[in-house]
Amino acid sequence: MKQQKQKIRIRLKGFDQGQLDRSTADIVETAKRTGARVVGPIPLPTKREVYTVLRSPHVDKKSREQFEIRTHKRLVDILDPTGKTIDALKMLALPAGVDIKIKAA
């Protein structure tokens, strides 16, 4: 029989690209330090949302202003995680501007 390989897939999302890259580097460094193999970080497509609003409160339909928000995403796969890897990832403090989703397979 084949041995079942364990894998942890971590998806990170954030508006600030620098903060996201630092968080990803922290996760990769923590996983490598505990002896797990790491695939990534893989940059996923950036979602760009543009909002257009009128500048004036009453008239002047031609005068508009546009705002945009970009959501950057990264993917990290941790292959063959040990118990130390999972404990170290639980103790890792990430900034508030980074959303993290962890899926074990």
UniProtKB/Swiss-Prot annotation:
The keyword Ribonucleoprotein applies. GO terms for cellular component: ribonucleoprotein complex; ribosome. InterPro entries: Ribosomal_uS10, Ribosomal_uS10_CS, Ribosomal_uS10_dom, Ribosomal_uS10_dom_sf. GO terms for biological process: translation. The keyword Ribosomal protein applies. One of its GO terms (molecular function) is structural constituent of ribosome. Coiled coil: none annotated. Pfam families: Ribosomal_S10. It comes from the Bacteria. Keywords: Ribonucleoprotein, Ribosomal protein. Involved in the binding of tRNA to the ribosomes. HAMAP family: Ribosomal_uS10 (MF_00508). Belongs to the universal ribosomal protein uS10 family. Part of the 30S ribosomal subunit. This is Small ribosomal subunit protein uS10. It comes from Chlamydia pneumoniae (Chlamydophila pneumoniae).
